[in-house]
Amino acid sequence: MSKNIALITGVTGQDGSYLSEFLLAKGYEVHGIIRRSSVDYRERIAHLEGTPNFHLHYADMGDSMSLVKLVGKVQPTEIYNLAAQSHVQVSFDAPEFTADVDAVGVLRILEAVRTNHLEKTCKIYQASTSELYGKVEEVPQNENTPFHPYSPYAVAKLYGFWIIKEYREAYDMFCCSGILFNHESERRGETFVTRKITLAAARIAQGKQDCLYLGNLDSLRDWGYAKDYVECMWLILQHKTPEDFVIATGVQHTVREFASLAFHYAGIELRWEGQGIDEKGIVASVSNPSLSHLIGKTVVAVSEAFYRPTDVVNLWGDPTKAQNKLGWNPQTTSFEQLVQIMVNHDMQKVAADHVASVMRTNLAEYLEKGIVK
């Protein structure tokens, strides 16, 4: 029996780390692409390093030759292209970089496979995005909903989607896009709104932050658990024919709902007052007497600084096709469970960070006084 060999771009990210764990558990030989950097950004996969069948290689989505060489060396049977500049707001500040990685990077992967004559033996999964729907024309969105990208990130991802489809039809390659709706976890980057909320709730509950500032509280999103979504990525490549699939829960929530639930799991109940830019989240009650000093205080406020130049306000995915054709369950982890997982993790993180800070302060003081040398 031939061995399953997976090559993952974006292996150090949220999805890459979960996918690596998933594939290793299935007996895959997993190869991940990392970039050379003076900063250590591998904490999400640190626990996997040294694991048999898990290998890391230096390459770059902006360097065609490095990808061609690596694909030729690894000879993968499956490629999961998860690498991206994936922050919508950043794409307005760095549109050219976003296009190079998120659009042309997909083409480089496809050509690396063709250059090594692996078109018939290597399947390719492309991580696409619900941001393709942008200024939505219908709800919920499915595989047939028209695209209306509303940011440089979404436009770049749209190229990636169409070039995958073109190579599938022109060269008979098994390449597919998974149109991922928002998927979160305790490994989510701290600049993304969900992780920003759960960290702030934990910090406010532990006296490390006074207020959380957000943008449009009415924005609607379909949030799922990243750990569940990587299973669907794999199922897409196991399907008998190459097709594109929406990966979503089919359930929608506002940013306001996410914030309310996050603070609830941190022991703080909010009430909302005002509208638009003047809306505020005020502490109505607390579960622990030690937090009683917060009652009546504003802990969530709206800031225009966090409004996007063009804001996508209504993303809601229809996962029916993935359910029927792949047998995937989009709600293995509920919205409430997801938020609780993230808050519990961040409560522990904030507490651990505080202990580490105290230890560093004490050590500095002891060194200054000559107590330790």
Roles of regions detected by a PLM:
Residues 226, 285-329, 348:
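Conserved C-terminal active-site "lid" loop/helix of NAD(P)H-dependent oxidoreductases
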Residues 136-140, 150-152, 158, 162-238, ...:
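NAD(P)-dependent short-chain dehydrogenase/reductase
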Residues 247:
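Conserved metal-phosphate-binding beta-hairpin within the catalytic cores
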Residues 70, 94, 101, 196, ...:
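Generic alpha-helical secondary-structure signal
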Residues 5, 211, 242-244:
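Residue-level preference for the first positions of well-ordered beta-strands
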Residues 62, 93, 101-104, 151, ...:
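Residue-level signal for the nucleotide or nucleotide-sugar donor/cofactor binding architecture
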Residues 1-183, 227, 233, 237, ...:
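N-terminal Rossmann-like NAD(P)+-binding domain of SDR-like oxidoreductases, especially those catalyzing
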Residues 326-355:
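A contiguous, mid-protein "functional segment" used to position or interact
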